[in-house]
Amino acid sequence: MEQDCDVLIAGGGPTGLTLAILLARRGLKVIVAEKEAAPYPLPRAAHIDHEGMRILQEAGAAEDVFATSRRVARYDFLNSRGKLLLRFDGVDRIGPGGWPSANMIHQPSVEAALRRSLQRYPDAVLNHGWEVGSFVDDGDGVTTRIGTPEGPKTIRSRFLIGADGARSPVRTAAGIAFDDLQFEEPWLVVDVLVDDETRLPAANLQICDPKRPTTCVLMGEGRHRWEFMILKGETAEQVSDDAFVATLLDPWDVKGAVRIERKAVYTFRARIADRWRAGNVLLAGDAAHQTPPFAGQGMCSGLRDAANLAWKLAAVVKDGAPDALLDSYQPERARNLRATIDMAIMMGRMVCTTNRWGALARDLKIGIARILGKQPNRPSGYPTIMEGLIIAESNAAGSYFPQPVAPDGTRLDDVLGAGCWLLSRDMLSAAPIRPFAPAIERWLDDRQSDAVLVRPDRYVFGTGDPRDLRAAWEEATRLRPAALGDPVAAAREDIRI
């Protein structure tokens, strides 16, 4: 049966748009079906980390996103008296991904940057007002019925990706269940436009007050956000009332400094799909997992999904890699994702304590940890890939490969491009890579390795002898070296394989 596209993506949010761009960059024909008639204009996600920015860099949107975002140096947890419990410091510094660790964003601006980038690829089309309905996977591809403003359409694709949010119709139709991780708390979110920034906190804050746990964070594009926990006995209608919201904001003394743009009640949940793949149907973003917002990793997790999935889909569709390559998607992402959710739950339980004595015990425990020097000063890193497409016994396999930044501001990825890299010590004098050689050499020294093979999603396939790495990669993927990206200059021929 003739295909209309290689990949049909249900959902035109950050995950779906990023995946579409990364696929189009690799030569695939992509259709994005977004059910809403127009882009959602109000804020939602507020944070992207360094790894998320690196993924947006490959998608051609990072500079635009960076220009509209804000940096914040501290993330403070305060008790009911305003005393410091815990501080994550220096989160505005450059992280391993080559961008600041914390970037406070305005989601509509992020999506606008991604839509502009998508327009550069004629084989990638975003359709608003297209709602995915039923679909049939016959093993060779997926036939999907879509409701459009012009009437029903049928789209034939090799793969269907459900990036259609927490209520994902694709997930439901595929019969995929959620594993509930036992965190469910209702909160009121209040987003404001800022007229006088000097009257607002300069740090991100978690107010661990048992009377009313509260979050206060910066956002991009001249905005700020408060989140107030909804207490037992309160209703969504009650807490959304203008007068009630005004009483919540009164202690912050921001009257006249801000204007309310949006208020909404959300239930913060922790859930993960028990399967991320059902034949030629795969899930990504909130359709596959939901993370409480306390670690700021909701959007970031969806971007990681897109980065992991894009190169594998392209390898299968375009380069003849085995379909089983896609079976590595969930094992690789799920462990990292569970660690992300666990951290968010831990932070959430610390913040969401509403029992006075429980809060006192928490404060004492944190205080003792600070005295003993056992208190972290930044969020812990996420685990390496432990199973999947890696040489498991190889040093540093599955770890995240950093992106050095040259003295002139050039980033490694922009020089070497997309695809798989084979970096060895004897290549570090090549002109394109010379500005980054000291950082790469230190990385190899620390791991006592002669070479590293870096996957297209910038995770380490393995370290060791260059010839052995190349052979192992070809055996694992069944890809010919030429299929992993043609060299763009003679000096790069041995780097990009």
Predicted features along the sequence, with ranges:
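Glycine-rich FAD pyrophosphate-binding loop
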Residues: 24-44
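Helical substrate-recognition/capping region of FAD-dependent monooxygenase/halogenase enzymes
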Residues: 1-6, 10, 26, 35, ...
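Active-site-adjacent segment of FAD-dependent monooxygenases/related oxidoreductases
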Residues: 44, 49-117
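N-terminal Rossmann-fold NAD(P) dinucleotide-binding loop
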Residues: 16-17
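Core beta-strand elements of the Rossmann-like FAD/NAD(P) dinucleotide-binding domain
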Residues: 3-5, 150-159
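Conserved FAD-binding catalytic core of PHBH/FMO-like flavoproteins
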Residues: 116, 159, 163-268
